[in-house]
Amino acid sequence: MARTKKANDEVPTDSDSLKLKVAKQAAKLVKDEMVVGLGSGSTANLFIQELGKRIVEEELYIYGVPTSFDSRMVASTAGIPLISLDQCGEIDLAIDGADEVCKSTLALIKGGGGCHTMEKIVDYYAKEFIVLADEGKLVDSLGDKTPVPLEVIPFAYSTVLNKLLKLNTAPAIRSGSGKMGPVITDSGNMIIDVFMSIEDAEETEIMLNNIPGVLENGVFSKCDKVLVGTSKKVEILKK
């Protein structure tokens, strides 16, 4: 008798295969004795799993710096030794995913999973920051399809909303799934998603962070390289 497909069964998609392709490629970039920033999200999790396989098979001496509770759990399961940011001194390489990648500037929007604050700290402190994406994440200009997430201190959420409205953006408090009320980050803050067009990523990143009450935003203007999974190969984009 055939098994009835359940609503929560995961069916692999073309996007999933492209994510796995870039994850495998990225894992090969890690060298012995490196400290590696471990990003968060579906693509980053695949990278973490592939890196764990390399550590076991090749007996590599590597430490990972997780950017969320989720990446910490995935890394622990994969057998990657973990170290905190204040213990490592420096990070050799950070590997992370993205929600949008601007093809011309390699600026990013991240934070669909609400982890962008810790991701940005780790990614920006790394000597090299590499992003993994499937070709569907490439855009001509940031903000066309994906909102910019802001991590906001709960005390200031209403004033931040008012400020964003005055800037002619369309802000919305991110609601949780599986619970009533707003999404709460690993650091205990709220997420406001902002729909806006972005002409200059660096200026927008600075402007949003200058709003009192905003801890960090999901515009990443700094990225060294992007590995893009396509149906034919993994393309490498550089500035």
From Swiss-Prot:
Presence of keyword Isomerase: yes
Catalytic residue list: E119
Domain of life: Archaea
Pfam family, one: Rib_5-P_isom_A
GO molecular function: ribose-5-phosphate isomerase activity
Pathway(s) it belongs to: Carbohydrate degradation; pentose phosphate pathway; D-ribose 5-phosphate from D-ribulose 5-phosphate (non-oxidative stage): step 1/1
InterPro entries per UniProt: NagB/RpiA_transferase-like, Ribose5P_isomerase_typA_subgr, Ribose5P_isomerase_type_A
Record carries keyword Transport: no
EC numbers on record: 5.3.1.6
Gene3D superfamilies per record: 3.30.70.260, 3.40.50.1360
Leading EC class: isomerase
Catalytic reaction list: aldehydo-D-ribose 5-phosphate = D-ribulose 5-phosphate
NCBIfam families: PRK00702.1, rpiA
PANTHER family in alphabetical order: RIBOSE-5-PHOSPHATE ISOMERASE (PTHR11934:SF0)
Protein known as: Ribose-5-phosphate isomerase A
